[in-house]
Swiss-Prot record:
Modified residues (Phosphothreonine): 736
Organism lineage string: Eukaryota, Metazoa, Chordata, Craniata, Vertebrata
Cellular localisation: Cytoplasm; Mitochondrion; Cell projection, Axon; Secreted
CDD domains documented for this protein: GlyRS-like_core, GlyRS_anticodon, GlyRS_RNA
Protein name: Glycine--tRNA ligase
Chief subcellular location: cytoplasm
Recorded catalytic activity of this chain's protein: tRNA(Gly) + glycine + ATP = glycyl-tRNA(Gly) + AMP + diphosphate; 2 ATP + H(+) = P(1),P(4)-bis(5'-adenosyl) tetraphosphate + diphosphate
NCBIfam families: glyS_dimeric, PRK04173.1
GO process annotations (BP): diadenosine tetraphosphate biosynthetic process; mitochondrial glycyl-tRNA aminoacylation; tRNA aminoacylation for protein translation
Lineage top rank: taxon: Eukaryota
N6-acetyllysine: modified positions: 204, 501
Length: 739
């Protein structure tokens, strides 16, 4: 144990240097240049050598090998400390160091990716803003950070992503959809744990009141100090140790660090207030009296849990079943950033799959068992390994994924995300380590996408066990359970209190109900203990809802009897896939954004047709009136077929109009040209956005072709196999005018 201890407290960078071979130490360009605490969601500043696309797989692995070793050694240390039942403070420090080393490894992996694999974010964001996909809310008043308005194109894309979600999950799985209020009384969120645990530490500029998240500000300040050439090796090592443990500091420890490192406001240079705990929920009061505090909901899940009994009744009392809700949630982020990735109001789509804890098998798992996807298990993370592509069925068989219900939803999530435009090669499922788990979860896998910000969580798939239902049942005294028929009846011994309602009512008046409710939910062990006190002392004391009551023999006795059971009560476990639709949208933007080869100014989004904001455009080649009947005919037919489309009859060249529609991701384009007008049967061209190839078909056929393409019933390859490629017009403007 003593030989392991120095690694625990030494600066992480120094520890890593000790693990590097001399050959790499002689090549400083290959060493890590970013601070250890660089988060996986922070923009990566690539080292010169590592950013070259010429670094091959073997060369990259040579750089990564010592970092993997450092993570593996720290993971071994964490395991040993836990096995030896070391003090919790030592375990926490070791875990913090492990997380820091993981971040270093991941940052380096991202830095070594090919240069052409990184989207030009500035160019993409310019396109999004210029074409009004979305923009900052209240912009003409200066805007409010963390709040966004979606324009026509962004709104259509978002609605299509939601509609695809409904079809993929709610319709396919026959999930029960509900729509609950966004206002939530305080007791509900007190019970769920959000009031006590949903908080961050915050500091304020003492002069202008501007707020900053304390850990983020301290991290940025220390990174700035460490980048100074005058900063000594000892000082850097000290600051790296601070950064490695940043997640574990309490309020007073953070306050001391702000003083020690003289942290000021990064905007004004003013002094900062001491850190205070800041709850991330938006607080309000329900009703004019101000007597009922409440919050805007931080998640949609609680509404489903509170309606569990009604949903169970709707499902004829049977398990398993699932309920879902799509709606807005709110988190009062201290310093929102990174566009749609961290906002204060966001749309969520959540599923709560209620299942018997003894029967966590999904009958449809074989439908997804053969999928191959990248899995990043907790074991791989602490061993310094990368995500590994695995067959989903093998992952469940080998115990990487706990059960087929969780495995089934991971597979369905993968299929949905790739359907809406997320690249399978930039998508992984990462298992939470034990110290990362939310207060309500016993296992959790996040779908993470690789973006220019690094790996970001876009979907969480948590096994919430029976946490929420049990908490709400205890708080409300309402049993949130399902009844499970027994294969054979069984006889059980029952022990319960038998209260004397008259005596209790006389003694405690209006509080008698509290006493009766408490006695009704006591378990056998507690009742037996209180019975002994009754026999010995003639009384015992109970405490409920902050009040104490003394009960005597004339108020209560204990009843024992046998009971034959035909059903047993089960508190269901809950598997919860939770989708952040804003983050999914942002990932789709990055993964589908392209620049036309040979023309840096022509950008386009290759949205899959199923979610494209417009399925096709209708483009008359000329403004001649003879073209207008065909425009009208096509537009009306497309509408009848349920195909969203955009008519562009402006005077610009056809190439420029193609570029405009490509820029907003219109999947296909119908062009009415001179052959359409001059020849019978009347035909028009259909253009594919991504390949820019065109076919020619009769005008009457085109709406159904576009509909089938948009619904995924056929592919562009199918269309090209059935219809002739368009090579060029056979007639021109002159013939049209003469006619």
């Amino acid at each position: 144990m003593p030989s392991l201890r120095p690694v625990l407290f030494r600066g992480a960078r120094a520890a890593l240097l000790l693990l590097l071979p001399p050959r790499l130490l002689a090549r400083p360009s290959l060493l890590l240049r970013r601070p250890l605490s660089a988060p996986s969601c922070a923009p990566i500043s690539l080292p010169a050598a590592a950013s070259r696309s010429s670094v091959d797989g073997a060369g990259a692995e040579e750089v990564l090998a010592p970092l993997r070793l450092a993570v593996r050694q720290q993971g071994d240390l964490v395991r040993k400390l836990k096995e030896d039942k070391a003090p919790q403070v030592d375990v926490d420090k070791a875990v913090a160091e492990l997380k820091a080393r993981k971040r270093v490894l991941e940052a380096k992996e991202l830095a070594l990716q090919p240069k052409d694999d990184i989207v030009d974010r500035a160019k993409m964001e310019d396109t999004l803003k210029r074409r009004f996909f979305y923009d900052q809310a209240f912009a003409i008043y200066g805007g409010v950070s963390g709040l966004y308005d979606f324009g026509p194109v962004g709104c259509a894309l978002k609605n299509n992503i939601i509609q695809t979600w409904r079809q993929h999950f709610i319709q396919e799985e026959q999930i029960l959809e509900i729509d609950c209020t966004m206002l939530t009384p305080e007791p509900v969120l007190k019970t769920s744990g959000h009031v006590d645990k949903f908080a961050d530490f915050m500091v304020k500029d003492v002069k202008n009141g501007e707020c900053f998240r304390a850990d983020h500000l301290l991290k940025a300040h220390l990174q700035k100090l460490m980048s100074d050439k005058k900063c000594s090796v000892e000082k850097k090592s000290e600051m790296e140790s601070v950064l490695a443990q940043l997640d574990n500091y309490g309020q007073q420890e953070l306050a001391d660090l702000f003083v020690n490192y003289n942290v000021k406001s990064p905007i004004t240079g003013n002094d900062l207030s001491p850190p205070v705990s800041f709850n991330l929920m938006f607080k309000t009061f329900i009703g004019p009296g101000g007597n009922m505090p409440g919050y805007l909901r931080p998640e949609t899940a609680q509404g489903i849990f509170l309606n569990f009994k009604r949903l169970l009744e709707f499902n004829q009392g049977k398990l398993p079943f699932a309920a879902a809700q799509i709606g807005n949630s709110f988190r009062n982020e201290i310093s929102p950033r990174s566009g749609l990735i961290r906002v204060r109001e966001f749309t969520m789509a959540e599923i709560e799959h209620f299942v018997d804890p003894s029967e966590k098998d999904h009958p449809k798992f074989q439908n997804v068992a053969d999928l191959h996807l990248y899995l990043y298990s907790a074991k791989a993370q602490v061993s310094g390994q990368s995500a590994r592509k695995m067959r989903l069925g093998d992952a469940v068989e080998q115990g990487v994924i706990n059960n087929t219900v969780l495995g089934y939803f991971i597979g369905r999530i993968y299929l949905y995300l790739t359907k809406v435009g997320i690249s399978p090669d930039k998508l992984r499922f990462r298992q939470h380590m034990e110290n990362e788990m939310a207060h309500y979860a016993c296992d959790c896998w996040d779908a993470e996408s690789k973006t220019s910000y690094g790996w970001i969580e876009i979907v969480g798939c948590a096994d919430r066990s029976c946490y929420d239902l049990s908490c709400h049942a205890r708080a409300t005294k309402v049993p949130l359970v399902a009844e499970k028929p027994l294969k054979e009846p069984k006889t059980v011994n029952v022990v319960q209190f038998e209260p004397n309602k008259g005596a209790i009512g006389k003694a405690y008046k209006k509080d008698a109900k509290l006493v009766m409710e408490y006695l009704a939910i006591c378990d056998e062990c507690y009742i037996t203990e209180m019975e002994m006190l009754l026999n010995e002392k003639g009384e015992f004391t109970i405490e409920t809802e902050g009040k104490t009551f003394q009960l005597t023999k004339d108020m209560v006795n204990v009843k024992r009897f046998q009971k034959t059971l035909y059903v047993e009560e089960v508190v269901p476990n809950v598997i919860e896939p939770s989708f952040g639709l804003g983050r999914i949208m942002y990932t789709v933007f990055e993964h589908t954004f392209h620049v036309r080869e040979g023309d840096e100014q022509r950008t386009f989004f290759s949205f899959p047709a199923v979610v494209a904001p417009f399925k096709c455009s209708v483009l008359p080649l000329s403004q001649n009136q003879e073209f207008m009947p065909f425009v009208k005919e096509l537009s009306e037919a497309l509408t009848r077929h349920g195909v969203s489309h955009k008519v562009d009859d402006s005077s610009g060249s056809i190439g420029r109009r193609y570029a405009r529609t490509d820029e907003i991701g219109v999947a296909f384009g119908v062009t009415i040209d001179f052959d359409t007008v001059n020849k019978t049967p009347h035909t028009a061209t259909l253009r594919d956005r991504d390949s820019m190839r065109q076919i020619r078909a009769e005008v009457s056929e085109l709406p159904s072709i576009v509909r089938d393409l948009a619904n995924g019933n056929i592919t562009w390859a199918d269309v090209e196999a059935r219809y002739p490629l368009f090579e060029g017009q056979e007639t021109g403007k002159k013939e049209t005018i003469e006619e």
